[in-house]
UniProtKB/Swiss-Prot annotation:
UniProt keyword annotation of Ribonucleoprotein present: yes
Coiled coil: none
Family affiliation: Belongs to the bacterial ribosomal protein bL19 family.
GO-annotated molecular function: structural constituent of ribosome
Gene designation: rplS
Function: This protein is located at the 30S-50S ribosomal subunit interface and may play a role in the structure and function of the aminoacyl-tRNA binding site.
InterPro entries referenced in this protein's UniProt entry, alphabetically: Ribosomal_bL19, Ribosomal_bL19_CS, Ribosomal_bL19_sf, Translation_prot_SH3-like_sf
Lineage: Bacteria, Pseudomonadati, Pseudomonadota, Betaproteobacteria, Burkholderiales
One Gene Ontology cellular component annotation held by this UniProt entry: cytosolic large ribosomal subunit
UniProt record, GO biological process: translation
Keyword Ribosomal protein: yes
Listed name of the protein: Large ribosomal subunit protein bL19
PROSITE patterns (UniProt xref): RIBOSOMAL_L19 (PS01015)
Amino acid sequence: MNLIAKLEQEEIERALAGKTIPDFAPGDTVIVNVNVVEGNRKRVQAYEGVVIAIRNRGLNSNFIVRKISSGEGVERTFQTYSPLLASIVVKRRGDVRRAKLYYLRERSGKSARIKEKLVSKDRAAAASQE
């Protein structure tokens, strides 16, 4: 492993200290809690939407979450290892056949729905034991 890769790995471990990032994939509905600083106040803001893209680039990894707010589509890009991310919660697993769901930008209503990925009972039991 070269020097830059080692430094990036150390920074990733430092960023993950005390928090866990769940496994999520494009199509999943997630709730991203973000630390927001307004003046001297600090609060946590929740952003819920569908993950439409994940970009794995080591320390520079990010993901895009899309939601519909007041009838308008809003997309927000989050840095995976950012200290501003308080937590990520996977609310619902989506069953999609693409890695990038940019086609959802042109769709609205029923055509923008994503099927839910149903896991079998024995797989769910095995996952809960780990």
